[in-house]
A protein has these predicted regions:
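Metal-dependent nuclease catalytic cores in nucleic-acid-processing enzymes
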Residues: 199-230
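Substrate-binding beta-hairpin/strand module that engages nucleic acids
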Residues: 223-246
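Hydrophobic pocket-lining residues within nucleotide cofactor-binding pockets
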Residues: 143, 234, 260
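Active-site catalytic microenvironments for nucleophilic, acid-base chemistry
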Residues: 90, 94, 217-221, 263-266
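Catalytic cores of nuclease domains that cleave nucleic-acid phosphodiester backbones
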Residues: 4-6, 72-73, 77-196
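Charged, glycine-rich intrinsically disordered N-terminal tails and low-complexity linkers that flank
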Residues: 1-83
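Conserved small/polar residues in nucleotide/adenosyl-binding loops
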Residues: 256-263
Length: 267
């Protein structure tokens, strides 16, 4: 299933993505806002100061240690996720696929140096390939909307006749439950802001909105019709990958589109 030469699109030359910094540059100069940052504007931010103080008092340790513990977990999750995406891209390019990641964190309170195995995730990816024997149209495709000045990266897109399907790789314990169903309800009753106030504040719904915004960008700027969108979850707490079809969320896309200029000006 190795992908051949990338299908060239005249828009590709204008956008550059730097994954470590998570920065998109338009024509090497103007910075575009990642779609994930756009979505976060429509949900209440986590009050890390309040909750770290609460947890520190509970455990009788410093607030700084709590914040570092959270920061190290977040850094590990992001770094391993980025690494997994790179390895999947290597597979499609015919390059060696590594199954172990070296994570280091050296803070004031937290010091971590460990090897993290992605053997289970790799096996799940191979199982996905066995069940989806098609050649991708594009992988790791940076796309953008130059009017809204937003950009994002599609993990894999498949051409099926005259339409396309989007696939998004995820490595997370917070998207599906033990039975493989999406975690679609926030346990604390928290929801989105404004007209998104009926959408539960969970990673699952954040990713669903993200895929719908990718669909919007592609259909508006690339003359591509998106038929299906999927989240594909690889995780070390199960032997099987999980494939979730993403629902169309036209109202959410319309609202985020209309509010984008106003909201992003505050970033």
């Amino acid at each position: 299933y190795k992908i051949g030469e990338p299908v060239f699109c005249e828009k590709d030359v204008h956008i550059q993505f730097y994954p470590q910094e998570h920065i998109y540059l338009y024509d090497g100069q103007e910075q575009f806002i990642p779609v994930s940052s756009v979505i976060s504007c429509f949900f209440k931010p986590f009050d890390s100061y309040y909750w770290s103080e609460y947890k520190a008092n509970q455990r009788n340790i410093s607030q700084g240690q709590i914040l570092e513990e959270w920061d190290s977990k977040g850094a590990c999750s992001r770094d391993v996720g980025t690494f997994m995406h790179q390895q999947i891209e290597n597979y499609y390019k015919g390059l060696p696929y590594q199954q172990e990641f070296s994570f280091k964190y050296d803070g004031k309170y937290v010091h971590i140096e460990e090897q993290i195995s992605l053997e289970l995730e790799y096996m799940q990816f191979i199982e996905f390939l066995e069940n989806h024997k098609f050649k991708p149209f594009r992988t790791e495709w940076a796309i953008y909307d130059d009017e809204l000045k937003i950009a994002g990266t599609i993990d894999m897109i498949h051409k099926r006749g005259d339409v396309f399907d989007i696939y998004d790789w995820k490595r997370s314990h917070r998207i599906v439950d033990f039975w493989g169903k999406p975690i679609a309800v926030n346990n604390y009753g928290e929801k989105g802001l404004g007209e998104l106030n009926q959408i539960e504040d969970t990673p699952y719904w954040h990713y669903c909105i993200q895929q719908n915004l990718y669909r919007y960008i592609l259909e508006r700027n690339y003359d591509i019709i998106i038929e299906k969108m999927y989240l594909v979850v690889f995780c070390d707490d199960t032997n099987e990958y999980r494939k979730l079809e993403v629902p169309r969320m036209d109202e959410a896309v319309s609202y985020t589109h209309l509010r984008a200029h106003e909201t992003l000006s505050d970033l």
